[in-house]
Amino acid sequence: MRPSLVIFDCDGVLVDSEPITNRLLREDLAARGLDLTLERIEEIFVGGTMATVFENARALGADLPDGWVDWFYEQMYAELAKGTPLIEGIEDVLDQLDAAGIPYAVGSNGSLRKMSITLGSHPALHARLKDALYSAHALGVAKPDPELYLKPARDAGIAPEACAVVDDSATGCTAGVRAGMRTMGFAEHNDGARLKAVGAEPFHRMADLPGLLGL
């Protein structure tokens, strides 16, 4: 069944920003006494907010000063501004949604500033999405709270059960499932088991998404 609205996560779904952020985070935490592999960084932190990263890293022994979150944001923004690649195939997905007359939105735990930087590396894509960006920072709620996906649906006047979510983290997929939406778990670099465990339907190539959505 075709959805009436598709809501995408941003990092790791539209733009391949997570490797950049994870590398910066690993380097900084190692310098502050918490040496983790990139795999552990992804397992522990991906899909959350920087505030929860701060809390969890401190609990694990990182010597993080007050004000670290704001400081790290500035480091991250500067690095992302050098250029953030798109997820392969995402533009074709949006083209097919446009051809089918199906609207789409973005729901992210990241800030609007971050999305403007990462998506802004691709002006044509940013122009397609800029009026449908929903940020946890602006809404005051973050995934796994389903509100980050329910709000775009309400604004579009579309029932949750007629929507599809595309997310790459267990946290985000949990939000989609809790929202009562069909949730597609994008597992580009793993088997998708963690996404399936929270109720998502894993898939591994963005090129496969149109077929899964019945386009």
Where on the chain are the PLM-derived regions?
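Asp-based, Mg2+/Mn2+-dependent phosphohydrolase catalytic module
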Residues: 1-4, 91, 95, 111-215
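N-terminal helical cap/lid subdomain that shapes the substrate entry/recognition surface
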Residues: 2-10, 14-100, 116
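Conserved G/P- and acidic residue-centered "switch" motifs that form tight phosphate/ATP-binding loops
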Residues: 9, 13, 108, 168
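Residue-level marker of regulatory loop/turn positions in helix-turn-helix DNA-binding domains and
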Residues: 86, 107, 141
